[in-house]
Amino acid sequence: MNKSIFIQLQDQIDKEHSIREKLTAEVDLLDEKLRVLQLLLANCEQNLENQEEILEALEIIKSKTRGLAELASNFPYYKYNGVWDRSIQKVVYLYLLASWTGRLDKSLRPTYSLLSLSEVGQILQVPVFPEESTFHLSIEQYLHAVLSLCSELARQSVNSVISGNYHIPFEALNTIQKVHSSFQVLSLKNDSLRRHFDGLKYDLKRSEDVVYDLRIHKLV
């Protein structure tokens, strides 16, 4: 048997491993910044004093995302997109949350409303519907991010009641209801996305319960 065949295969394996290592290093740097922003946004309705920190973190994440996009665009998208897929979902989710809570430019979207996929791409300066298979924000990443936002809004509904911000649960419920009804028109082919959507009914119920309790106790 000609061993050169396996030597060539090993060379290709080493090459692909090197590419994955480079991409993973960029993703790790991005993830580190995402953790910082997530902490800043965790109770953003109760703490409006960290606006400058949030804006700075958003800009850093934007820069890191564009850096990853530039690097990743040198390689076949569908071969390596699994390296950054979850991290980019989180980028989109945190930008949706920042916008919903009024931490982004309100000329893009008013507070308590949802950025579109195209708007997120415009903010990050990353392609959304590319003609070629290069780095971009995918529809699936956006939909996962929207569902994650709903889970966070349901969680923050409870926290906002504790802190006396009684209007937040109503805004959150309005958004979750709209997302729930909008997802009904989609024919989801992605198994992961279908499972994620299945959990939305629990977020909706949780949010409805908070609003019901507020009304029953005449707090609004």
UniProtKB/Swiss-Prot annotation:
It comes from the Eukaryota. Keywords: Cytoplasm, DNA-binding, Meiosis, Nucleus, RNA-binding. CDD domains: Translin (cd14819). It holds the Pfam family Translin. It is found in: Cytoplasm; Nucleus. InterPro entries: Translin, Translin_C, Translin_fam, Translin_N, Translin_sf. GO terms for molecular function: GU repeat RNA binding; microsatellite binding; single-stranded telomeric DNA binding. One of its GO terms (cellular component) is cytoplasm. The keyword Cytoplasm applies. One of its GO terms (biological process) is meiotic cell cycle. Deletion of both tsn1 and trax results in slightly stimulated cell proliferation. Forms an octameric ring-shaped structure, which is capable of binding DNA or RNA. DNA-binding protein that specifically recognizes consensus sequences at the breakpoint junctions in chromosomal translocations. Selectively binds single-stranded d(GT)n and d(GTT)n microsatellite repeats. Has much higher affinities for the homologous RNA sequences (GU)n and (GUU)n. Does not bind double-stranded DNA. Has a role in meiosis. Belongs to the translin family. This is Translin-1. It comes from Schizosaccharomyces pombe (strain 972 / ATCC 24843) (Fission yeast).
